[in-house]
Amino acid sequence: MNKLNKKDFSIFANFLNKLAKDLTKLYYSKLSKNFKVSNKLRGKGYDPVTTSDKAFEKFIRSKIADKFSNHQIIGEEFGHKKANSDFTWVIDPIDGTRSFVIGGPTWSNLISLNFNNLPIMGLVNFPVLNKYYINEDDKSAFVYEKQKKRKITVNKKATFNYARLTAAFHGHLSFEQQKKIPKIFSMNNFPTADALSYMQVAEGRLDAAIQCGNHIWDIHPSIPIIRAAGGVVSNWKNQEITSTDNVLVTPNKLIHNKILKLLKPIS
């Protein structure tokens, strides 16, 4: 899947660990107040973007350019910076902009490092919650919370019958489509919160997260962390996620395959 050795992982992990701290400082010093909000859809719906989204992305891009000037960058707000490199950084400056706009705590900064278009390292940073998640190689994932580091793993005792599930279908599935997956709605459902839901599977607090219409910047940063924590992630057809797609995250293949079967009528 990748050609990174231990030294490579260490270089990128050190960069992302520092970047997480810098992003949190930037939020509290300059971006938490007096931001402006606009609507990307302009009368066709509501997809908010703020001046803080753009400032975060510019900051992240500048840090990447300073350290890895030959790498490609894809960001939600400023598009694709192409380069002659197999490495691409994928950025969602604020995942959960609606939460950000109303002063909620569950929005995050998302960054992945992709090699040959597949994510190999990820950072999910929650400035307000004062924690961030990261994989420091392909077999170990961690949460840094209140300056303390803790290794995370999925719930290894999870079973399908007692799986704790979160699903975000609003705005994506019609009522007719939802009627085709009744079992999903009869499972142990919990609130959903964008990338936080994926991280809650990675650290064993949830046993399944289902989302619709994720862009690569919405999901790629979480994928290496989930897999390094022992989890399983795919689209609803059990394929790698390489473009905008529906997402399923679980702690093991047994639960994964059973939920995929439940989703099959609409996948």
Regions found by a protein language model. Name each.
Residues 1-94:
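N-terminal subdomain of lithium-sensitive/metallo-dependent phosphomonoesterases centered on the IMPase/IPPase/PAP
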Residues 23-27, 53, 64, 97, ...:
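Residue-level signal for inorganic ion chemistry
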Residues 54, 77, 93-96, 127, ...:
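Generic detector of well-ordered alpha-helical packing
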Residues 83-142:
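DPxDG-like acidic metal-binding loop motif
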Residues 134, 141-145, 167, 208:
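Short hydrophobic/aromatic-rich beta-strand segments that constitute the beta-sheet cores
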Residues 139-149, 254-258:
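Short helix-loop capping/hinge motifs at secondary-structure junctions, enriched
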Residues 153-267:
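An extended, acidic
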